[in-house]
Amino acid sequence: MEIVNCIGKKGDTNFAILYPSLRSNKSLVIELIKKIRKNHKTLVFSNSHLSAELIAFNASKQGIKIGIHRAGLLPKNRKMVENSFKNGMIGVLSSTPTLELGIDIGDVDAVISNLVPVNRLLQRLGRAARKGQEGYAFLTLGNDPISQYYKNHPADYFVDEEIPYIDPFNPIIMENQILAMCFDRPISKLESKEYLETLSKLQRKDLVIFNNGKYTPTNSEKQNVLKNYSIRGIGNDVDILFNGKIVGNRNLPHALEELHDDAIYFLSGRRYKVKKLILDEKTERNFADIDTIPINYPYYTKPIREEYPQVIEIFEEKEIFGIKLKYCSLNIYKKVLGYSNIEIGKEINQGKKVFFNDPITYTYATKGFIFRVPSPKEILKMASEKEKIEASGYHATEHVLIEGSSMLTGGASQDIGGISLGDTGMIVIHDGSIGGNGASKSLFDKFELAITRAHSILIECSCENDDGCPRCTYSYRCGNNNEYLHKNAAIEVLTRIINRERTTILEFNNFQQTLI
């Protein structure tokens, strides 16, 4: 064996961090693409499906030849986009993290990235200038709480490292992995002790049998269960149909929010309208039928939803400042009540609301933690609508805790949901995946720093609106149309936490309105 040491060919890369004080993040990105694309192949990274699709959609409207690469598209379509970019047929590619590593897309001259932890940013920027040419790299901040924080504390960005999070005990993953183990080699009674609960579930589903002291698959046809299992997501998929053909898919529970009836869905830079969402619990055959809409249709949609939590089992407890936190397993009862129409090109998080006659309901098991925050007593002394102001303060607190801690938890805010339980002060922060993904545990472990950072974001934001603004209290994931928010009440809540005001966790079953 011969070990070869050498230095790879890598050109100098010019790097800039940009903060859009007078425009939206998407407008800034489009302007960068227009300036760079003529002589430089450009890769644009977004952190969500919708952001990547909106970049491609808006760029196409301005005459830019751009492809899109993300999960949920058919593999053959992703491969076609990769080859088109590699061969120079398109000069700009809008992508989610699917292109961060491991896929050959040829030479890249410029990289534009939304906000991610610094070690992931370096991975993205490493895509540029690999053939020795001069490269260009841009980190574009946005109109959101964590971007506002880094604008005021830029040095913190370079010390906030990504800590990978995972939940190895996710029951969905365990069932599929242990079933695969049985196909590989029967599991003996002796080695099955730590898997007994999962093996019992597989037995009840008639996937394995216990015979002659070993667990074996019931028959070879059960391998079809594994063929339908994807490491890209957890839980069942919803197939997306156009003219009777599958053109993509989306995981539950996220599919409920993006593929409900009349939702506007972005696919490969184009917009479609969902004619009907079908969820068949018996056959697990789930699909959404989509159709084209006029090019000049002015809106896209965001869901209006409610969620109700149920605590199943407490795993861990601790106290931060005067707040008790309990990490636990949960059932989340989700309702999609309707949607908001958001005007294309407008950087707003509120829109005209449409409600369904029959809300879509779905229940899933996950993990998260619960806690109770103190009441904003001083604000309430002057308030005429005390219950509304109090609930709005707790809702804003929940938003900024999740959005503002994103880089502390390795960007986990995208995989986290939050529920504020009316005017009780009870807040639930949970994993957004069926069975759990470890994201909320990451925030649970760094909760003290999350509190102080959330407090800084609110007091440093110059807006004077009662409900705050996109840079402090708003969340693009809000299920309540970014309504019922109160910035000053949230500041008082967080100040009281930092001053170690103690609270007691309440038992909860049925509260009035929840805010998410």
What label would you give each PLM region?
Residues 127-130, 464-474:
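Conserved phosphate/anionic-ligand binding catalytic regions in large, soluble enzymes, centered on
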Residues 5, 473-476:
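Extracellular/secretory pathway and lumenal proteins
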Residues 497-516:
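Acidic, low-complexity intrinsically disordered tails
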Residues 134-137, 143-160, 175-191, 223-464, ...:
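Extended Lys/Arg-rich polyanion-binding regions
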Residues 1-185, 192-225, 234-235:
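Helicase motor core with emphasis on the C-terminal RecA-like subdomain
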Residues 31-39, 476, 496, 515:
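ASCE P-loop NTPase motor cores of helicases and related translocases
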